[in-house]
Amino acid sequence: MATKIRLRRMGAKKNPFYRLIVADSNAPRDGRFIEEIGFYDPTKQPEVLNIDEEKAMKWLATGAQPSDTAKSLLRKAGVLAKYHESKK
């Protein structure tokens, strides 16, 4: 089972917020997921980003591939830098 770290859209029309989830790569965007590892609210000022680093590191270590947007959010939170440091 190939897993992806990606965003799940939540909220009302024209007022989105996103949950960062781990899901099977074949599952639909807002469908079934394995675990929630954080959330992102771009509508707040400043933007709210909360990621459980421990869960994210665990899933990255097991081979979950982040989507492009999820990768940029993980980089913004400093999780990717810590992951690459732990691999060395």
From Swiss-Prot:
One of its GO terms (molecular function) is structural constituent of ribosome. This is Small ribosomal subunit protein bS16. Keywords: Ribonucleoprotein, Ribosomal protein. InterPro entries: Ribosomal_bS16, Ribosomal_bS16_dom_sf. It holds the Pfam family Ribosomal_S16. GO terms for cellular component: cytoplasm; small ribosomal subunit. Belongs to the bacterial ribosomal protein bS16 family. HAMAP family: Ribosomal_bS16. One of its GO terms (biological process) is translation.
